[in-house]
């Protein structure tokens, strides 16, 4: 029986983040959406225009008997730039900022220790925010499993 837990990460464009995590052994499901803002049921347009305060996130449901929260955090750190505020690559805006949203005190502690450890390897200061999870609003259907639907788009991680 699966020991299902949830993790939520903001690490730039949620399409790429979802594609990364959905291939990981122990991940049960992924869903992209919005978290951390002040508008109920925001649209992609509202988020992109900076009108909602939300972050693009990937919600990861995983079996903690197969993969740990620490393992997921390692993937998080290694697959985006946590030192650049409000930007990942070509994507610019608050919605692309680096965030870890936690559900339990245990997740918060693990995330904080992970950030401290990661900072030792970085020349620049990590700007990743670690915040208590708030309401998750699923993104529109066309954003879900985006790269899987566009099977001619392949990402290399």
Curated annotation (Swiss-Prot):
Record GO biological process: protein modification process
Pfam families from the UniProt entry: PMSR
Domain of life per record: Archaea
Protein name, per record: Peptide methionine sulfoxide reductase MsrA
Annotated active site: 13
Function: Has an important function as a repair enzyme for proteins that have been inactivated by oxidation. Catalyzes the reversible oxidation-reduction of methionine sulfoxide in proteins to methionine.
Enzyme Commission number: 1.8.4.11
A molecular function GO annotation: L-methionine:thioredoxin-disulfide S-oxidoreductase activity
Keywords for the protein's UniProt record, in alphabetical order: Oxidoreductase
SUPFAM superfamilies found in the cross-reference section: Peptide methionine sulfoxide reductase
Broad EC category: oxidoreductase
InterPro entries, alphabetized: Met_Sox_Rdtase_MsrA_dom, Met_Sox_Rdtase_MsrA_sf
Annotated catalysed reactions: L-methionyl-[protein] + [thioredoxin]-disulfide + H2O = L-methionyl-(S)-S-oxide-[protein] + [thioredoxin]-dithiol; [thioredoxin]-disulfide + L-methionine + H2O = L-methionine (S)-S-oxide + [thioredoxin]-dithiol
Family: Belongs to the MsrA Met sulfoxide reductase family.
NCBIfam families found in the cross-reference section: msrA (TIGR00401)
UniProt KW tRNA-binding keyword: no
